[in-house]
Swiss-Prot record:
Coiled coil: none
Gene that specifies this protein: INHA
Subunit record text: Dimeric, linked by one or more disulfide bonds. Activin B is a dimer of alpha and beta-B. Inhibin A is a dimer of alpha and beta-A. Inhibin B is a dimer of alpha and beta-B. Interacts with TGFBR3L; this interaction regulates female fertility.
Described function: Inhibins and activins inhibit and activate, respectively, the secretion of follitropin by the pituitary gland. Inhibins/activins are involved in regulating a number of diverse functions such as hypothalamic and pituitary hormone secretion, gonadal hormone secretion, germ cell development and maturation, erythroid differentiation, insulin secretion, nerve cell survival, embryonic axial development or bone growth, depending on their subunit composition. Inhibins appear to oppose the functions of activins. Inhibin A is a dimer of alpha/INHA and beta-A/INHBA that functions as a feedback regulator in the hypothalamic-pituitary-gonadal (HPG) axis. Inhibits the secretion of FSH from the anterior pituitary gland by acting on pituitary gonadotrope cells. Antagonizes activin A by binding to the proteoglycan, betaglycan, and forming a stable complex with and, thereby, sequestering type II activin receptors while excluding type I receptor.
Localization: Secreted
Stated name of the protein: Inhibin alpha chain
Signal peptide region: 1-18
GO BP field: cell differentiation; cell surface receptor signaling pathway; cell-cell signaling; erythrocyte differentiation; hemoglobin biosynthetic process; male gonad development; negative regulation of B cell differentiation; negative regulation of cell cycle
Organism of derivation: Homo sapiens (Human)
Length: 366
């Protein structure tokens, strides 16, 4: 609340018309913003004459991580995720009813596992997938196997019968095998049910929980389809010709007085402009908003109160005592903080600090 009043008083011009007039001078706004930062963070550490916290430039490994070129939009972070799927079959080596069938399959070196990819996984693009299988074999046993026949083979059930799944063996810890599915086989994880048949003549069926096989799928958001890209690239239709459209284009510009009502003013401020680029190293700049304008609109006596939770409009005073004159100011409770990264030793160490209640979100006549 103290910062609310301070911001309100600092950004109020002197004189009787406290909420009206032209936009504030940039130098005045910078001075008030500098006072708000010093009130919240305190003065920067002085390491030499002149009040500059060091002259050594920020190392590139720190500077490149947070700075962006002015005028460039920050790149959107790619939506990637990883899913781990375990077999959904109820049969195991400990089930007496299924022990005979599983034992027969194990004797033949064939292991059957059913996976059920989630709706989230099926709705995304699978970029890679690996099947982790506990072979129980050490590297010596693997090397001693018959080299004329592959140690592991992978099949997938389809309506037409089992089909071979292209894969390659990757690096794995002892007693395990990691099968990397080829790109052409990644579409298998888009089906609701995936049944894999793994052929390993030297492997045995294990009922230990830590030996349960599993699938690891890496996914990302699907790229837009061709039709969606075409819709995005289709130019907007031209404005239909009509006399009303012509009159709208030929109308004179609005007077400055039309924007004199209470509104939020935006100002891009860089810390280099404030002289603190060696103290506050990130962000390099921020958008500062303050409230400005008049509240001279006629207010009917039967005006209903604003809806709770919704910011009032300039024509609806937030709170007005009898005989008091409304003034354009930030709506209490809607101010947001600004998080900054500071250094006091020229970039050897950093500190993350917060300037509370600095960014104005809503303005109202109060």
């Amino acid at each position: 609340m103290v910062l609310h009043l301070l911001l309100f008083l600092l950004l109020t011009p002197q004189g009787g018309h406290s909420c009206q007039g032209l936009e504030l001078a940039r130098e005045l706004v910078l001075a008030k913003v500098r006072a708000l930062f010093l009130d919240a963070l305190g003065p920067p550490a002085v390491t030499r004459e002149g009040g500059d916290p060091g002259v050594r430039r920020l190392p590139r490994r720190h500077a490149l991580g947070g700075f962006t070129h002015r005028g460039s939009e920050p790149e959107e972070e790619e939506d990637v995720s990883q899913a781990i799927l375990f077999p959904a079959t109820d049969a195991s080596c400990e089930d007496k009813s299924a022990a005979r069938g599983l034992a027969q399959e194990a004797e033949e070196g064939l292991f059957r596992y059913m996976f059920r990819p989630s709706q989230h996984t099926r709705s995304r693009q699978v970029t890679s997938a690996q099947l982790w299988f506990h072979t129980g074999l050490d590297r010596q046993g693997t090397a001693a196997s018959n080299s004329s026949e592959p140690l592991l083979g992978l099949l997938a059930l389809s309506p037409g019968g089992p089909v071979a799944v292209p894969m390659s063996l990757g690096h794995a810890p002892p007693h395990w095998a990691v099968l990397h599915l080829a790109t052409s086989a990644l579409s298998l994880l888009t089906h609701p049910v995936l049944v894999l048949l793994l052929r390993c003549p030297l492997c045995t069926c294990s009922a230990r929980p830590e030996a349960t096989p599993f699938l690891v799928a890496h996914t990302r958001t699907r790229p837009p389809s061709g039709g969606e890209r075409a819709r995005r690239s289709t130019p907007l239709m031209s404005w239909p010709w009509s006399p009303s459209a012509l009159r709208l284009l030929q109308r004179p510009p609005e007077e400055p007085a039309a924007h004199a009502n209470c509104h939020r003013v935006a100002l891009n401020i860089s810390f280099q402009e404030l002289g603190w680029e060696r103290w506050i190293v990130y962000p390099p700049s921020f958008i500062f908003h303050y409230c400005h304008g008049g509240c001279g609109l006629h207010i009917p006596p039967n005006l209903s109160l604003p809806v709770p939770g919704a910011p009032p409009t300039p024509a609806q005073p937030y709170s007005l005592l009898p005989g008091a004159q409304p003034c354009c100011a930030a709506l209490p409770g809607t101010m947001r903080p600004l998080h900054v990264r500071t250094t006091s030793d020229g970039g050897y160490s950093f500190k993350y600090e917060t300037v509370p209640n600095l960014l104005t979100q809503h303005c109202a006549c109060i």
